[in-house]
Design a protein with these regions (language model features):
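Short, flexible, basic/aromatic active-site loop/helix in glycosyltransferases
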Residues: 164-168, 179-205, 211-221, 453-473, ...
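Short, acidic, metal-binding catalytic loop of nucleotide-sugar glycosyltransferases
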Residues: 22-23, 46-57, 67, 77-82, ...
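Active-site-proximal specificity loops/subdomain of glycosyltransferases
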Residues: 70-134, 348-409
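Catalytic phosphate/metal-binding cores of nucleic-acid and nucleotide-processing enzymes, i.e., regions
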Residues: 35-37, 42-44, 74, 78-79, ...
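Conserved donor NDP-sugar-binding/catalytic core segment of glycosyltransferases
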Residues: 129-130, 143-184, 427, 432-457
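An acidic/histidine-cluster motif and surrounding catalytic segment
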Residues: 167, 211, 231-235, 241, ...
Length: 588
């Protein structure tokens, strides 16, 4: 690594000290093989355009076939628009047939499909060699390179085959750390420290796939081949395994780099999945990127490049709710933008509710609303009174409850602006609604996002209804369904006259709060509360994450502007109970 870095540095120093003009950027062939990728191409192509690399030093090699969507049209239109920017364009479309003879579905990888893709990749490799290209960049059409310096950074590693580690919603990534004697994936303890970036660098691995750079200037690269398989190859017919075996037989080591965040890609759907499943999975990838402080702006810029031209018109709706309320502080415009876009991508419409800014409330405001804190209330973690942020949060939800009652809204969805959606969120929410309606569940409130506090016993499941439980003591009001009857019950409790945080008030109202003294102030506690299980939304950030901001806990005490909360986040018991935002899922 030191030697490679020194070599690259010496080249840079030589260029800087030389009075002659600088060297041209290396010649790159970008090989793209797309099938049924209309849903991902606008973002993928936008990310390619945004790479900080001279376009006139890049040749595009693009193939597409066996499509049942408008992938061909999108690629053709894009190539026509950008062809003068790039050095060369090779375009290989094939309209028919729309399916392989031996595949039961579009997501099934049959032998004919594997062989076809390998032949296309080999054709791209041979074209790159004929053009005397310095590098071949292979990229799948749903891989989003949000780091604009990716190409330069990979080149600087001076490796024959090197991949940028791609992020996903699970532990899955575009490399293997282990391979069995038959060429299949093997779990190893080395994988997760690399995947989580607990160890950073460029690591020798037996397999990289999806997006990687091949240095054609290396002599050993002449022995690399995607097709046909090496004469000694006896493993399964799989394009990535065949190429990894070719690299092994050529004594070429594959590397994966995780020094930075380079980009994102979706977790592959199962072979029996539909194209719609894949579309929704990719939408979730977009939402995950928008939830990351590192990727949000890059994705926002690229998305608009093609959206208005090539994507079908999006018709947001309320999916059966009378209203969808999204709470947002006016000064948190970044959150508002992200949430509106996230909802739009899922074809969901909402009413933006301006949150009550607790910091802007003064003593006169509080007295005019006749607000009084619940006698004896202290935060269970910090032994402090209510904060102004918590007061503002409560009033924001309270105002929505009033609107639901005033408008007579039978069913509403209430969400906050700091949540991230689980994969297939819309479909799962619709299924939940259908189940509740079908079995005539008598409900007032259904959490779709929360922090369950009573973890020492299981919550009671609801007979005949999948994925719903009776809610026990819970924190957070990230998202919940509320009925008209539920809103009326909450208002009848007159909570402003005995105020406590909203996520403490709700468990009181469904008679599950562990502090009996609090419940004693509310005579009627008959709110019928349930929860989706598993949950449908989670926080965008957990305490301690980079980019974490709390508008409720880090503020002054509600009735004393001079008294700030001496809250040490690192020592917080709540922090310890929340834990970190760990990778969910498995490697595959």
């Amino acid at each position: 690594l030191v030697e490679a870095g020194a070599t690259f540095l010496s080249k840079i120093l030589m260029i800087l000290s030389n009075p002659e003009s600088p060297l041209l950027a290396p010649r790159v062939v970008l090989a793209v093989v797309c099938r049924n990728s209309a849903h991902s191409l606008p973002l993928f192509l936008g990310a390619i355009e945004r790479l900080d690399y001279p376009k006139d030093r890049v040749a595009l090699w693009v193939a597409t076939d066996h499509n049942i969507d408008n992938t061909t049209a999108i690629l053709r239109d894009w190539l026509i628009k950008v062809q003068n920017d790039y050095h060369y364009v090779e375009w290989r479309p094939q309209e028919e047939p729309r399916a392989f003879e031996d595949e039961p579905g579009t997501k099934h990888w049959s032998n004919l499909r594997y062989e076809h893709v390998m032949k296309l990749r080999q054709a791209a490799l041979e074209s790159a060699r004929e053009m005397w290209a310095d590098y071949l960049l292979v990229a799948d059409c749903d891989n989003l390179l949000t780091n604009t310096d990716t190409l330069w950074k990979l080149m600087s590693e001076n490796k024959t085959i090197v991949a940028p580690m791609l992020e996903s919603r699970a532990a899955y990534s575009n490399f293997w750390c282990g391979m069995t004697s038959q060429g299949y994936y093997k779990r190893t303890p080395a994988y997760m420290p690399i995947r989580k970036q607990e160890q950073r660098g460029c690591f020798a691995v037996p397999m990289v796939h999806s997006t990687y750079l091949v240095d054609l200037q290396k002599e050993a690269s002449r022995q690399l081949a995607f097709y046909p398989p090496h004469p000694e190859y006896s493993w399964a017919l799989d394009d990535v395994i065949v190429f990894a075996y070719s690299a092994r037989m050529a004594d070429v080591q594959m590397y994966v780099c995780n020094k930075e965040t380079y980009g994102y890609f979706p977790v592959p759907v199962r072979s029996h999945a539909t194209l719609q499943d894949e579309v929704e999975s990719f939408v979730h990838t977009q939402l995950e990127i928008m939830g990351e402080w590192r990727g949000q702006r890059a994705l926002t810029k690229t998305r608009m490049t093609y959206l208005h031209e090539v994507m079908e018109s999006c018709r947001p709706n309320k999916i059966g709710f009378d209203e969808v309320f999204m709470i947002n502080l006016v000064r948190r415009s970044d959150r508002r933008e992200r949430m509106l876009r996230s909802l739009y991508e899922q074809e969901l419409s909402c009413k933006v509710v301006a949150a009550v800014d607790g910091k802007a409330l003064n003593k006169t405001d509080i007295e005019s609303m006749r607000i009084k804190m619940l006698p004896g209330y202290k935060d269970p973690y910090h032994s402090r009174p209510l904060t102004k942020g918590e007061l503002g949060c409560f009033l924001s939800h309270y105002n929505i409850w009033k609107e639901i009652a005033d408008r007579g809204l039978q069913t509403s969805l209430v969400i906050e602006d700091d949540l991230r959606f689980e994969v297939f969120f819309k479909r799962r929410l619709q299924t939940l609604l259908q189940e509740v309606t079908k079995h005539k569940l008598d409900w007032d409130l259904i959490y779709i996002g929360r922090k369950r506090m009573q973890v020492d016993h299981q919550e009671k499941s609801v007979p005949n209804i999948h994925n719903i439980v009776e809610a026990d003591y819970s924190y957070w009001t990230l998202g919940y369904l509320l009925s008209l009857q539920g809103a009326q019950k909450l208002l009848r409790a007159e909570p402003l006259s005995k105020l406590l945080p909203v996520d403490e008030f709700l468990p009181v109202m469904y008679n599950k709060h562990p502090v009996s003294e609090y419940m004693g102030h509310f005579e009627v506690r008959d709110l019928r509360a349930f929860s989706a299980e598993p949950l449908l939304v989670y926080p965008t950030h957990y305490t301690g994450d980079q980019g974490y901001i709390s508008d409720t806990e880090t503020s002054v005490v509600w009735d004393n502007e001079a008294l700030k909360t001496d809250w040490d986040r690192a020592k917080s018991r709540k922090t310890q109970e929340q834990g970190g935002a760990e990778l969910r899922g498995s490697e595959l």
